[in-house]
Amino acid sequence: MAMRFLNIGYGNIVSAHRIIAIVSPESAPIKRTVQEAREHNALLDATYGRKTRAVIVMDDGHVVLSPIQPETIAHRLNNKEDLSEEGWVLHIYEK
């Protein structure tokens, strides 16, 4: 079984199989979601002070801010060959 990780910018990675949604931060409902996550200490800011271009919602309720466009992240997620070539696939073998 392989555990896939996804580069979301500036060397930050998230577990690919735990992503529920990758959305643009511009709409009011997403802004409210980000604010609620901040209030509940469930917000992870991976922008390094740059503009937030994507909001990633994880299956455990965490919200991750990324400086990369949602389309770029989705392309990386769908392109399995790029993930393995860049070293973002971790193979875990269970006994």
Swiss-Prot record:
Source domain of life: Bacteria
Annotated disulfide bonds: none
InterPro entries: RemA-like
Database matches in HAMAP family: RemA
Assigned protein family: Belongs to the RemA family.
NCBIfam families, sorted: MtxBflmRegRemA (NF046064), PRK04323.1 (NF003315)
Protein name from the UniProt record: Putative regulatory protein BC_3870
